């Protein structure tokens, strides 16, 4: 049987790191998108189009990573709730 030595509060705190990281990535993407819009006004031609094409492909990978971070956040929160429920059930089994 596994021994759980982490508290639900610790798990929820750790889960927050994942969602905060996702939010930081969102902010970085917004900055880059804004920069791309500015550059697009001045940089014309095939080189810029190639850059945008590559950026859009890589952007999809970043979005997948963001989804992963959000998923891990949800899983950690769900597990924290499960640990808390199990602990409460165990406490009730002693009849105090």
Curated annotation (Swiss-Prot):
Coiled coil in keyword set: yes
SUPFAM superfamilies membership: EsxAB dimer-like
Keywords: Coiled coil
InterPro entries the UniProt entry points to: ESAT-6-like_sf, T7SS_ESAT-6-like
Coiled-coil segments on the chain, per record: 9-86
Family in the record: Belongs to the WXG100 family. sagEsxA-like subfamily.
Protein name: Uncharacterized protein CA_C3713
The organism of origin for this protein: Clostridium acetobutylicum (strain ATCC 824 / DSM 792 / JCM 1419 / IAM 19013 / LMG 5710 / NBRC 13948 / NRRL B-527 / VKM B-1787 / 2291 / W)
